[in-house]
Curated annotation (Swiss-Prot):
Keywords on record: ATP-binding, Magnesium, Manganese, Metal-binding, Nucleotide-binding, Nucleotidyltransferase, Transferase
Protein name: Protein nucleotidyltransferase YdiU
Binding site for ATP: G84, G86, R87, K107, D119, G120, R170, R177, D256
EC number(s) reported in the record: 2.7.7.-, 2.7.7.108
Residues holding Mg(2+): N247, D256
Length: 478
């Protein structure tokens, strides 16, 4: 089957990119590819059997027209000016059978005009982390970019140490970022901001294209998508680590996996990025940061969208966030209905977990085993203050009895939203260390496990992290 690529971005937004081709690595070789995703995209298996090829930037497929995008942004709350694809190249936009498109973005593809002081490369460590994280999030049901392939090489890349140069093929319906809009707003070119908005609406919100108030309606949906995404992050204990405006997806996708982390111990102020000295992007601050970022996006639209309409959309953020968060957390607790005491029970559980440094994922998974007519709970042994847990658990069981469902029905719901497996940093690190020694077995094994996060397991993927695996420091270097 021949893959079809189109050039919408190149044709319709000529001032937003520089056309250039990838720079191949030395002795590049394909070490992992996503068979399930490749099948979904109708990619012939033969493309994965001819060396690094397109996956290593050595060849282009017919119809591809590679380019690096320019955008700007606020980083850690400070205007950073022009940024752009410093090591990534958009190879092409694949046209799928249903009329939708999928960007093929090659990360680590070499120097671009936007590399600034960088070398345009990615390392094996960071490409493995992004591949694992994006696929883990996908199978958790959270909107995200996806990983299609990893290529490693003999090219040295200099970071804190000398590492192997690598490339990741990332795919997504669009790589439109808040930062694209900021770039032209701060260059005082509002007509180009409008062109970006028109492009987005035409191709991704086409049902709004003929609406008189299309820009307000579109921005309102961007707000809603962002609020929903952040709510989902919070419910699974995911910390992004670097929520700069240039890392915010217009479509509400999780984008740019760098120093991310899933909660081990429940620590509301968890900081996964060791460069985040002030805790701006701490776990509990993510909802506020996302709203701040949306306010920056709204500012770029203010030359042609009524401020009252933009503010109305921004005002909807908190309610959308709380609605999505509340619905999911009630499911995690096994509540089939909404009752006035639900928030108090949840907050009391969080307080208990924070005092005890309880494991976030294990706590909710073990809670899924609760039988409402039994005072015994396998979760009890996870707490030191048994009296405090017993008090909470007694009130929790009374609350469960208000919903007329069987234990089996409730447990099935809870186990469908409380994963047994999340991508803890130590699991990723173990796969990385093996891969850096040439052994890809654990990389493939972990990828396979992450496809079924809600299934019970009895291996160390679902155990508490070892002492060395807790609070692994992760930086933005990739």
């Amino acid at each position: 089957m021949t893959l079809s690529f189109i050039t919408r971005w190149r044709d319709e937004l000529p001032e937003t990119y520089t056309a250039l081709s990838p720079t191949p690595l030395n002795n590049a070789r394909l070490i992992w590819h996503n068979t399930e995703l490749a099948n979904t995209l109708s990619i012939p298996s033969s493309l994965f059997k001819n060396g690094a090829g397109v996956w290593g930037g050595e060849t282009l497929l017919p119809g591809m027209s590679p380019l690096a995008q320019v955008y700007s942004g606020h980083q850690f709350g400070v205007w950073a000016g022009q940024l752009g694809d410093g090591r990534g190249i958009l190879l092409g936009e694949q046209l799928l059978a249903d009329g939708t498109t999928m960007d093929w973005h090659l990360k680590g593809a070499g120097l671009t005009p936007y590399s600034r002081m960088g070398d345009g490369r990615a390392v094996l460590r960071s490409t493995i982390r992004e591949s694992l994280a994006s696929e883990a999030m996908h199978y958790l049901g959270i909107p995200t970019t996806r990983a299609l392939s990893i290529v490693t090489s003999d090219s040295p890349v200099y970071r804190e140490t000398v590492e192997s140069g690598a490339m990741l093929m990332r795919v997504a319906p669009s790589h439109l970022r808040f930062g694209h809009f900021e770039h032209f707003y701060y260059r005082r070119e509002p007509e180009k901001v409008r062109q970006l908005a028109d492009f987005a609406i035409r191709h991704y919100w086409s049902h709004l294209d003929d609406e008189e108030d299309k820009y307000r309606l579109w921005f309102t949906d961007v707000v809603a998508r962002t609020a929903s995404l952040i709510a989902q992050w919070q419910t699974v204990g995911f910390a992004h680590g670097v929520m700069n405006t240039d890392n915010m997806s217009l479509l509400g996708l999780t984008l740019d996996y760098g120093p991310f982390g899933f909660l081990d111990d429940y620590e509301p102020g968890f900081i996964c990025n060791h460069s985040d000295h002030q805790g701006r992007y701490s776990f509990d601050n993510q909802p506020a940061v996302a709203l701040w970022n949306l306010q920056r996006l709204a500012q770029t639209l203010s030359p042609f969208v009524a401020v009252d309409g933009l503010n109305e959309a921004l005002d909807s953020y908190q309610q959308v966030l709380l609605t999505h968060y509340g619905q999911r957390m009630r499911q995690k607790l096994g509540f089939m209905t909404e009752q006035k005491e639900d928030n108090a029970l949840l907050n009391e559980l969080f307080s208990l977990m924070a005092r005890e440094r309880s494991d976030y994922t294990r706590t909710f998974r073990m809670l899924s085993l609760t039988e409402q007519h039994s005072a015994a709970s396998p979760l009890r042994d996870e707490f030191i203050d048994r009296a405090a847990f017993d008090d909470w658990f007694a009130r929790y069981r009374v609350r469960l009895q208000q919903d007329e469902v069987t234990d089996s029905e409730r447990q099935q719901l809870m186990q469908s939203v409380n994963p047994a497996l999340v991508l803890r940093n130590w699991l990723a690190q173990r796969a990385i260390e093996a891969a850096e020694k040439g052994d890809m077995t654990e990389l493939h094994r972990l990828h396979e496990a992450l496809r079924n996060p809600f299934s019970d397991r009895d291996d160390d993927y679902v155990s508490r992290p070892p002492d060395w695996g807790k609070r692994l420091e992760v930086s933005c270097s990739s």
